[in-house]
Amino acid sequence: MTSINEQQVPVASPVIGEAEIDAVVQVLRSGNVVQGPEVAAFEERFAALVDGRICVAVNSGTSALHLLLLALGIGRGDEVVVPSFSFAASANAVRLTGADVVFADIEPDGFGLDPAAVEAAITPRTAAIMPVHLYGHPAAMDRLTPIAERRGLAVVEDACQAHTAALHGKPVGAFGAGGAFSFYPTKNMHAIEGGMVTTADPELARTVRLLRNQGMEQRYANEIVGANMRMTDVSAAVGRVQLGRLAAWTERRRANAAYLDDHITAPAVTVPPVAEGARHVYHQYTVRIRGDRDAAMARLTGAGIGNAVYYPTPIHRLKPYWEPDQKTGRAWDLPETDKAADEVVSLPVHPSLTEGDLERVVTAVNALGENP
């Protein structure tokens, strides 16, 4: 058990330092707190992370996905192939357009969409594939993109957890028709709240800009139906500060993950897989537990090690998706998704961890042995 003098090692540790506070105060004193010069500067700087693609800042990662799908013309009558092993926002963004979600299974040796399962899920109504770069590991874009190209489908990347992740040197958010990033406080970098759309298509970017601002480019000259999904200058100012620290934070995450990989030896625990050519940025360090996961988590918590399950219920088993499918008689056979949801546990990997913290994590995990 944790001693009275030991604090729990948290599974996540968002950073809001003096530089972020100073940046916010400067914006507040300027009087221009809504979308303005800070947002434009943040968009320009973020483009360097995605091979110079056009960036459009919005108010959340979910909005980024939603607006990107809308800008691509996806809506009622269309289908989008999505992994069920993800946060619900991936599927919610599709449903909000009026399109239908078609779930495909994940790979048995990873957490991303299985290209073979995607191929099998495609129908004449399929308009897009949405790979999710879950936990900071790139999906199999080298195999998914050719499927989309051959079938004439858009690729919409959910990169909300994967800032600076890459596959064979190409950054996520730069593969498909567009990508979506999140700046929620627990992400590898944050903007308090916010999101970013990335695309190489100027017309698509313009449509997203219209959609985020009530359909307007010029004030009161509405061109299309839109909404208020703008990022504020307050959020953008925080994002710009965090962006300057992202590289160092990411290398610390990767170093922490390497330490855990090298020192976790418990037979019941499988460390995160990394595909050949993949740059994993470890938004989460997610292991698989063989045996009684609840007992293992309780033991870790008792030892003062923060832990969490992302995500305990696959999307296809959540009420908004499960009940309609039961009414229509459609059933999803996603064995690898269900298996992962039963086995995964995320451990601390964030850049604020000390050497002592890492040693405590390893000691607690290895104490699980063969049978948690």
Feature annotation, model-predicted:
Residues 1-32, 37, 348:
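N-terminal "arm"/small-domain region of PLP-dependent enzymes with the aminotransferase-like
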Residues 157-191, 218-223:
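Conserved active-site segment immediately N-terminal to the catalytic lysine
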Residues 181-182, 195-201, 240:
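Short beta-strand-to-turn element immediately C-terminal to the catalytic PLP-Schiff-base lysine
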